[in-house]
């Protein structure tokens, strides 16, 4: 099996249509990633009329179809490219490039695929410059899915503090913690907007004793549904040696917001869950105790208590806190969350040496 740097470089160069890089297993993969993508020339498409775009030089014919979904910043359309169907993501505002976001999502997909989790992030297939839309990108269509918020609404036993509710939440957190641990460790990446609506659940594809091997450890997952991480519109990568930011999908907060930042992503999804009174009221004392432990930052502030008292529906206070240059999620690092769940919920997650 290729080492992770060779695997990552090969698949990225295939996308870029550049000669493969012959490299050893280096530790500073984010810098390699950044250097490979900075010189990429995005193909410019010509509008042929009626939503049809083409570029002879890039051998692309793209037909924009119906709108699939609309978020705060982006719009998803269905599209057909050379006879295959994808999502096409564009910014809601004209002349806003999604080039950085596209590459960050592509990089996340490649590295998680190396660890036997190709479903974890939808693959990016084309990055193109479309008239009136600027740089957009196509990606895999995720079928038979629901956001995790909707998944909880349909499967939680509300207002009943039971182990079944705990397990549903812990299954998701284990998957996300593994994704984030890999992205931070290998790509120096933070998602920076990890919340309930940016996680899709595919119930038709459960995980049964699914094994992921990372640096001499074998992680085994069991879950009633697979988690898919989406929307890299605020993601960033940083140099693992200097800790300096290299690339951001958004300029928001990047001047002081170092990347990666320990515990940041998992802290946000935990706060997003705990901020919902119905969720707090449907977890057992054991699960609540873990949330209270995880939601303490490096200043000693207990955000579980703060969120239970203060109404913050958009989590503005939490975003402000985690984007501060000195923030650390001391108890919400992926490794600590995985260890706590392994010790508290037998069968959801296990860890072995190999």
Q: Model segments located where?
A:
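Catalytic activation segment of kinase domains across protein kinase-like and atypical kinase folds
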Residues: 195-262
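ATP-binding glycine-rich phosphate-binding loop
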Residues: 25-82
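Conserved structural core of kinase catalytic domains
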Residues: 119-166
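Conserved kinase catalytic-core helix
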Residues: 158-192, 196-197, 205-206
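ATP-binding glycine-rich loop module of kinase domains
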Residues: 65-66, 72-115
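Membrane-embedded alpha-helical bundles of multi-pass transporters/translocases
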Residues: 60, 103-106, 111, 123, ...
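Active-site ExK catalytic segment of metal-dependent nucleases
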Residues: 87-94, 140, 230-233, 244-246
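Helical subdomain adjoining the active site within ATP-dependent kinase catalytic cores
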Residues: 2-29, 253-354
């Amino acid at each position: 099996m290729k080492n992770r740097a060779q695997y990552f470089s090969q698949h990225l160069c295939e996308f870029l249509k550049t000669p493969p890089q012959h490299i050893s297993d280096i530790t500073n993969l984010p810098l390699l990633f950044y250097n490979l993508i900075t010189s990429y020339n995005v193909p410019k498409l010509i509008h042929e009329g009626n939503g049809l775009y083409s570029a002879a030089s890039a051998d692309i014919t793209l037909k924009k179809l119906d709108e699939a979904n609309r978020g705060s910043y982006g719009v998803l359309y269905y599209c057909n490219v050379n006879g295959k169907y994808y999502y096409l993501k564009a910014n809601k505002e004209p002349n806003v490039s999604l080039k950085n976001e596209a590459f960050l999502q592509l990089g996340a997909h490649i590295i998680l695929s190396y660890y036997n989790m190709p479903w974890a992030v939808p693959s990016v297939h084309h990055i193109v410059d479309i008239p009136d839309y600027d740089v957009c990108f196509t990606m895999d269509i995720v079928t038979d899915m629901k956001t995790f918020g909707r998944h909880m609404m349909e499967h939680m036993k509300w207002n009943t503090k039971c182990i079944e509710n705990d397990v549903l939440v812990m299954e998701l957190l284990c998957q996300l913690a593994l994704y984030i641990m890999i992205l931070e460790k290998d790509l120096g990446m933070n998602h920076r907007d990890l919340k309930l609506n940016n996680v899709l659940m595919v119930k038709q594809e459960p995980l049964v004793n699914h094994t992921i091997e990372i640096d001499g450890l074998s992680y085994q997952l069991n879950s009633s549904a697979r988690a898919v991480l989406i929307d890299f519109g605020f993601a960033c990568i940083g140099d693992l040696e200097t800790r300096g930011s290299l690339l951001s999908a958004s300029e928001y907060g990047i001047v002081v917001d170092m990347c990666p930042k320990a515990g940041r992503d998992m802290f946000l999804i935990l706060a997003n869950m705990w901020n919902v009174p119905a969720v707090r009221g449907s977890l057992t004392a054991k699960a609540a105790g873990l949330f209270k432990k995880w939601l303490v930052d490096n200043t000693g502030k207990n955000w579980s208590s703060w969120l239970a008292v203060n109404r913050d529906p958009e989590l503005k206070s939490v975003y402000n806190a985690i984007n501060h240059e000195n923030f650390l999620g001391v108890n919400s690092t992926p490794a600590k969350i995985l260890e706590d769940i392994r010790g508290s919920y037998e069968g959801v997650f296990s860890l072995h040496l190999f």
